């Protein structure tokens, strides 16, 4: 389980690995003298505390706790896209194993303290480098994920999970070739450092966790 983080609007988030979820639920029931279930929300009998379970990406049809526990036994295949200024990583994940992947680094100049024409020249160069980096990243995503991103694919992905810098991810997915992936994009953005293979493997594990919103 990852440590609790404050949630916007109140409460806190915890993330539970699939194999630990049943034990976590047993603990919640025990601490609250039982709980009422309404879809994916548990309400503690002793004090009204609530826990709302958010299934991992690709579990769109899950509507109750029992259904979630059953679905977690055989999770769907998912795609990963991690992007930051200096690198991109794309992969296909079965369970928590990355079965297809590609990582590519690129150079984008940092900001400069120079002023006047020099600053404008650096800014133009930096913008050009950022555009070129997004284009190369889109090439990587097209090669790795598009073969799995359509309904008629032999082994389609059930969701696209993104991580890193949201602006960079958006720039990559703006490529028209990647339009078939957009309906699969999951809204939650993984927090990750500059992509490497090890980071991609860590993201494959993180993407499978069940996110739980606890109030209070």
Name each model-derived stretch.
Residues 1-216:
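Terminal alpha-helical anchor/extension segments at protein ends
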């Amino acid at each position: 389980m990852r440590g609790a983080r404050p949630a916007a609007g109140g409460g806190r988030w915890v993330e539970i690995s699939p194999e630990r979820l049943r034990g976590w639920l047993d603990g919640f029931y025990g601490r609250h003298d039982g709980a009422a279930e309404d879809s994916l929300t548990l309400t503690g009998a002793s004090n009204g505390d609530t826990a709302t379970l958010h299934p991992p990406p690709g579990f769109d049809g899950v509507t109750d706790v029992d259904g979630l526990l059953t679905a977690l036994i055989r999770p769907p295949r998912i795609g990963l896209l991690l992007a930051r200024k200096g690198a991109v990583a794309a992969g296909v994940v079965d369970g928590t194993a990355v079965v297809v992947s590609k990582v590519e680094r690129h150079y984008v100049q940092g900001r400069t303290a120079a002023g006047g024409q020099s600053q404008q020249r650096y800014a133009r160069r930096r913008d050009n480098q950022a555009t070129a980096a997004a284009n190369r990243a889109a090439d990587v995503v097209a090669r790795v994920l598009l073969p799995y991103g359509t309904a008629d694919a032999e082994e389609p992905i059930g969701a696209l999970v993104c991580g890193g810098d949201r602006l960079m991810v958006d720039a990559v997915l703006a490529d028209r070739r990647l339009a078939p992936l957009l309906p699969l994009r999951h809204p939650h953005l993984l927090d990750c450092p500059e992509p490497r293979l090890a980071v991609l493997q860590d993201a494959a594990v993180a993407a499978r966790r069940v996110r739980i919103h606890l109030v209070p």
